[in-house]
């Protein structure tokens, strides 16, 4: 009789769901208060004028205007601001 031995198990076989991180609104785009600008882990981008930061480091617009990205300071930090259109 033909037989096939039972296959072994592996410790792989799972994968986490993508978190959809990244820049959601780019420089020069019009934005409304409350809209998300960047979803991130840690502060890759820092909050500038008119921008708030959530507890998961998400940057969002506090005022209506246009998104502006800039590099400031001796450490070359990247800031996101919302300026009036």
From Swiss-Prot:
GO cellular component: cytosolic large ribosomal subunit
Protein known as: Large ribosomal subunit protein bL27
UniProt entry tagged with the keyword Ribonucleoprotein: yes
GO BP annotations, alphabetical order: translation
Swiss-Prot/TrEMBL keywords: Ribonucleoprotein, Ribosomal protein
Family that this chain belongs to: Belongs to the bacterial ribosomal protein bL27 family.
The keyword Transcription is annotated on this UniProt entry: no
Pfam families, alphabetized: Ribosomal_L27
Organism: Stutzerimonas stutzeri (strain A1501) (Pseudomonas stutzeri)
Superkingdom of the source species: Bacteria
Coiled coil: none
GO molecular function, one term: structural constituent of ribosome
InterPro entries xref list: Ribosomal_bL27 (IPR001684), Ribosomal_bL27_CS (IPR018261)
